[in-house]
């Protein structure tokens, strides 16, 4: 007979495999809710007065220099396919000096033999790497020791605590006790020597919530707003009964659009390191997010789709994103990301 721990680890590993399959094969994108960036437009400069070849996309984040303001957002781990994906993404991050986060490492604590699917530091020795676990696990017997093991597993520069109440509501046997979680996040922030990143999973962090998280000691906010992959839809596809499937459909478009998250968080925290993610699909989206106040931008689905195809597809995606961001800067007359952010080039449409 399997022990409860063995059963839990098998369920977690199966869930990870399901997530990859569903994201790649099913329509799990937001429909009625967009990322909100379409409400903004850059003012075109017909005389940029700069050489496109001199444009500098570099950014410094958490003390590390990135060649472009890009984060390969948290996606996967814990299965053989996930291990291959993470290796490919890590090599890309190393080659292009992007930041990278992995998917939840809970599965590797429950099943240590899959920890190697997260062991990517050897492929990305110079990359800004983020470890990852669900914040709610702090209410389910996880604490400092487990978080340190997760960080050490990746040799990570920071720890993502992903916050996903809606997903847990729809996920079969989800962990839904969020009571007192902010205090536990605060305690963990005090005890860890690496920065803690608070990240939603596609439903957004408001300015009011960011204020509480920052007061608790969180050092980075990743807004992960609505408009991209709907985890309500994903979990609805996995649902074991009609009620959960109904919940997935009902809340498929629930969340705060990414653009609103960026502006509201930046308004209450002018200097907090801020990551924009949630439905960003190209370099124009990334440039808009930076102009709205983000420091770097995270993409997950585009990198996942390319990684499953080939390393060549990943390289092509990276080159396209860089070219798109560069073109925005050139056609708005800005030579650096700092200039773009403070240029007033981005206008909200009426």
Curated annotation (Swiss-Prot):
Its cofactor is FMN; NADPH; Mg(2+). Its main location: cytoplasm. GO terms for molecular function: FMN binding; isopentenyl-diphosphate delta-isomerase activity; magnesium ion binding; NADPH binding; oxidoreductase activity. Pfam families: FMN_dh (PF01070). Involved in the biosynthesis of isoprenoids. Catalyzes the 1,3-allylic rearrangement of the homoallylic substrate isopentenyl (IPP) to its allylic isomer, dimethylallyl diphosphate (DMAPP). PANTHER family: ISOPENTENYL-DIPHOSPHATE DELTA-ISOMERASE. Belongs to the IPP isomerase type 2 family. This is Isopentenyl-diphosphate delta-isomerase. The lineage of its organism: Bacteria, Bacillati, Cyanobacteriota, Cyanophyceae, Nostocales.
């Amino acid at each position: 007979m399997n022990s409860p721990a063995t059963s839990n680890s098998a369920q977690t590993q199966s869930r990870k495999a399901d997530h990859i399959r569903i994201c790649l094969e099913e329509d799990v994108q937001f429909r009625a809710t967009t990322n909100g960036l379409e409400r903004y437009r850059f003012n075109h400069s017909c005389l940029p007065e700069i050489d496109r070849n001199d444009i500098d996309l570099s950014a410094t984040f958490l003390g590390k220099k990135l060649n472009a303001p890009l984060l390969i957002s948290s996606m996967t781990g814990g299965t053989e396919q996930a291990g291959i994906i993470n290796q490919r993404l890590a090599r890309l991050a190393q080659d292009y000096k992007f930041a990278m986060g992995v998917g939840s490492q809970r599965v590797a604590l429950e099943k240590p033999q899959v920890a190697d699917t997260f062991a990517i530091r050897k492929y990305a020795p110079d990359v800004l790497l983020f470890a990852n676990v669900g914040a709610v696990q702090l209410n389910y017997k996880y604490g400092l020791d487990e978080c340190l093991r997760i960080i050490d597993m990746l040799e990570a520069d920071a720890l993502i605590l992903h916050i996903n109440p809606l997903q847990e509501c729809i996920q079969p046997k989800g962990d839904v006790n969020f009571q007192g979680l902010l205090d536990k996040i605060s305690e963990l922030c005090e005890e860890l020597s690496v920065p803690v990143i608070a990240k939603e999973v596609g439903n957004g962090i408001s300015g009011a919530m960011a204020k509480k998280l920052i007061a608790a000691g969180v050092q980075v906010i990743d807004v992960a707003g609505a408009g991209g992959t709907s985890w309500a839809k994903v979990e609805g596809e996995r649902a074991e009964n009609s009620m959960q499937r109904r919940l997935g459909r009902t809340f498929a478009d629930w969340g705060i659009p990414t653009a609103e998250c960026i502006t509201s968080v930046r308004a209450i925290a002018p200097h907090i390191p801020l990551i924009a993610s949630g439905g960003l699909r190209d370099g124009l989206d990334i440039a808009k997010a930076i102009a709205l106040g983000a420091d770097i931008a995270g993409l997950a689905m585009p990198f996942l789709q390319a990684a499953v195809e080939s390393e060549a597809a990943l390289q092509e995606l990276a080159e396209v994103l860089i070219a798109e961001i560069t073109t925005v800067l050139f056609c708005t007359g800005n030579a650096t990301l700092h200039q773009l952010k403070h240029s007033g080039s981005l206008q909200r449409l009426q």
